[in-house]
Design a protein with these regions (language model features):
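Basic nucleic-acid-binding interfaces
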Residues: 1-138
Length: 138
């Protein structure tokens, strides 16, 4: 496992993002998905974000991406949803007839952290740190 780093820290921060079209309208095909991904990848570097995986269904997208401790994830998601909504409606005007009040994305989204050891393993590791540890005082 390769860790990312900056001047003062090492880290590996993966996120799974799910965004749905407003009222789950079935408007995402392969071409629309490619456009949505291109917009994501264009904005992402401004927030120290890198896309690792992308997939879609007709009414939502799944994105696996890496961030950094200074990545402002919620600001990025809001900027992305705003820009991609505007661009997809411009580039695919036929979609407008399926949208409610011109809104492409639902206001909500699901963001999950991923990777590393399971939470229960980390919890147990932290709880047992002082057990049977040699005295490190000098």
């Amino acid at each position: 496992m390769k860790l990312d780093s900056n001047n003062h820290s090492v880290f590996m921060m993966h996120y799974h993002l799910i965004m749905c079209v407003k009222y789950r309208r079935n408007v995402i095909n392969d071409e629309v998905s490619a456009s949505l991904r291109a917009t994501f990848e264009k904005i992402a570097p401004d927030y120290n974000i890198v896309v690792e995986e992308w997939n879609h269904d007709q009414d939502h997208v799944h994105v696996l991406f890496r961030g950094q401790p200074n990545s402002e994830i919620s600001k990025f998601i809001n900027a992305y949803k705003s820009a991609s909504s505007r661009l997809v409606k411009r580039d695919f005007p036929e979609i407008r007839q399926y949208l409610w009040k011109e809104m492409f994305w639902s206001k909500s989204y699901c963001l999950l952290t991923t990777g590393g050891a399971p939470v229960d393993v980390i919890r147990q590791y932290i709880q047992t740190q002082s057990e049977d540890a040699p005295d490190r005082r000098r």
